């Protein structure tokens, strides 16, 4: 694949346990990365990993979900990482529609680059 797109809800500062379990299954030496004398080397052919999420609160650049997916992209050898987050949907219900529309527009623009 040229790109990997992961979409998940933002729950309790991260993403669902089922997705974490999936990551454990695919994070395997010889499958998504390997080791050389120089250290860990990614084994994925994808050029881009995109993390899409939405949630009731606001996710930031330094939140667990974003950091984890950014680090996994690097570990797997995927050079480009982006994320789109529609956050604060419960915290600011009056602007939830605008927030979703902005995130969808950002995701659509990003999809054109894949």
What are these regions (language model features)?
Residues 67-114:
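Glycine-rich phosphate/pyrophosphate-binding loop and the adjoining helix
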Residues 1-67:
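Helix-loop-strand module that forms the ligand-binding subsite of alpha/beta enzymes
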